[in-house]
Amino acid sequence: MTESEFLKQAEATLDQIEATLEELANTSDLDVECTRSGNVLEIEFIDNGTKIIVNSQAPMQELWVAAKSGGFHFKAQGEQWMNTRDATELFAALSQMVSQQGGVEVVLRDAG
């Protein structure tokens, strides 16, 4: 994958995560605020002040996630982002992290 292809896929994924969480904040009990600065998406849980940070790392061609449960690296495999350690898909992993930190069961899905 070229750097421009990576950046395009990473940007689309960050956009999708942000849009999905904003929709969930409006339609469920999830109290979350998303802030985007370039390649960094900060997800703040209002009730407890914890955060999840998702950012793209172009040199490594990975998305990195920092959450209360730890740090995780995801590499593109086709249209999906897979955890480099245990092959968990990004949206499945984020669903679990957001549910844990937000105290509300949510499911995030990759629209791609």
Swiss-Prot record:
This is Iron-sulfur cluster assembly protein CyaY. Involved in iron-sulfur (Fe-S) cluster assembly. May act as a regulator of Fe-S biogenesis. GO terms for biological process: iron-sulfur cluster assembly. One of its GO terms (molecular function) is ferric iron binding. One of its GO terms (cellular component) is cytoplasm. The keyword Metal-binding applies. PANTHER family: FRATAXIN, FRATAXIN, MITOCHONDRIAL. The keyword Flavoprotein does not apply. Keywords: Iron, Metal-binding. Belongs to the frataxin family. Gene3D superfamilies: Frataxin/CyaY. The gene is cyaY. It holds the Pfam family Frataxin_Cyay.
